[in-house]
């Protein structure tokens, strides 16, 4: 591993992000420290703050990479599933599969809390916005008359519900035996929601 004068600031940022991502993947967010990141890249802990404001900023960028990875897993699904219900089910299943395959990276998205003095940057909000746009696409096919505000609320409502099932299922808090049953609960949720949307149930905005 090179020393400080061997890497530019951008290169140092990339090294830190990659190392932090690997630590979170293997040990979870609770296992991440600045000292571990520094050790992994061969620098002193203080050098990290040449590239980042603090450890929270490093985590934010790792979580951004996770959102980008998840987006790549789902972005093509609506175009491959002409039936909007099938598309919604496939999106939910892809989300659950990602959580199963990358549990620590996935949990980090929701476990990490920024300090009050550090608002979410625009680039991170843009990553979440495009995720919800993918979810909204089949819902807008089901109910074309939705306003943009209704579409946003509908996609967030469905995705939040799917996340709840995934989270409780992976933590074994649903009192169900195996992953197949988690998929069954997920399917029941999505089908019920989509049918309600198709039936014209009111969307509060």
Where are these regions (language model features)?
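N-terminal intrinsically disordered/low-complexity leader segments
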Residues: 1-11, 81, 201-205
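Ser/Thr-centered, proline-biased regulatory motifs
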Residues: 30-36
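Short hydrophobic/aromatic patch on the recognition helix
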Residues: 41-52
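Hydrophobic alpha-helical connector segments
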Residues: 75-104, 145-148, 154-158
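Amphipathic alpha-helical segments used for helix-helix packing
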Residues: 101-119, 136, 167-175
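Amphipathic alpha-helical packing segments from all-alpha helical-bundle domains
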Residues: 118-144, 152-157, 184-195
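Amphipathic C-terminal alpha-helical segment
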Residues: 158-177, 192-203
């Amino acid at each position: 591993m090179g020393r400080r004068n061997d890497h530019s600031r951008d290169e140092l940022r990339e090294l830190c992000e990659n190392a932090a991502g690997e630590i979170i993947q293997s040990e979870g967010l609770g296992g991440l420290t600045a000292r571990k990141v520094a050790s992994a890249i061969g620098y002193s802990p203080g050098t990290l703050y040449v590239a980042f404001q603090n450890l929270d900023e490093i985590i934010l960028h790792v979580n951004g990479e996770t959102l980008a990875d998840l987006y790549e897993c789902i972005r093509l699904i609506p175009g491959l599933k002409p039936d909007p219900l099938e598309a919604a089910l496939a999106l939910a299943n892809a989300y659950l599969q990602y959580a199963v395959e990358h549990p620590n990276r996935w949990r980090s998205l929701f476990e990490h809390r920024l300090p009050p003095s550090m608002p979410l940057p625009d680039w991170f909000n843009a990553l979440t916005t495009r995720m919800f746009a993918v979810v909204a696409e089949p819902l807008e096919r089901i109910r074309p008359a939705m306003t943009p505000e209704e579409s946003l609320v509908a996609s967030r409502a469905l995705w939040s519900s799917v996340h709840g099932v995934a989270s409780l299922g992976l933590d074994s808090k649903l009192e169900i035996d195996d992953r197949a049953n988690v998929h069954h609960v997920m399917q029941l949720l999505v089908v019920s929601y989509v049918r309600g949307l198709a039936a014209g149930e009111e969307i509060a905005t």
